[in-house]
Amino acid sequence: NPDYMGKAPQTAEEKKKFDKFLKYTRNQLLELMNNYPQMKGFWFDGTWDQSWIKSYEFTYNLEKELREKHPGLIIGSRFRNDEFGKRHFDSNGRMLGDYEQGWERKLPGDISWLEGRDWDCVMTIPPNGWGYMKDWSGLYTKTTDDIIDILVYSRSLNGNFVLNFGPDGQGKMHPEE
């Protein structure tokens, strides 16, 4: 979206532009919920940009609105921050959202905190391949056995496993994927 910015808006013009993006985001989410009333939830990503961190009041109110419109809606911990910029868990240690989305390209080492919590592990086939990567030379690529091991381990800890694929602009997959 051309109105999105990673840094926090500073000028009146930037704030106006980013507010346009926030309105667009809200309308898109509401449209999805209207068009797909049987949907179960949203999977979000990107709570590290300063613009989103500073929008904690917007995201708090939007989450509240989405839940009022669709009781039982499942929202992951990457949707919003608290007012102090804390992600996944607020400043009081409470999880933001319905399940923990902090396991990106890695699995939990200490599993004691998982007891009774829903979580997911988001994995790429190359080390950091979000989206299409033309050149994979010199990169370790996870094997089928690696992926199956991660899937089985995630499930053994009652986690969900999300595997990212990066097709090119024509929808074709890299041979290694």
Regions found by a protein language model. Give the residues of each.
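Mature catalytic domains of secreted/periplasmic carbohydrate-active enzymes
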Residues: N1-E177
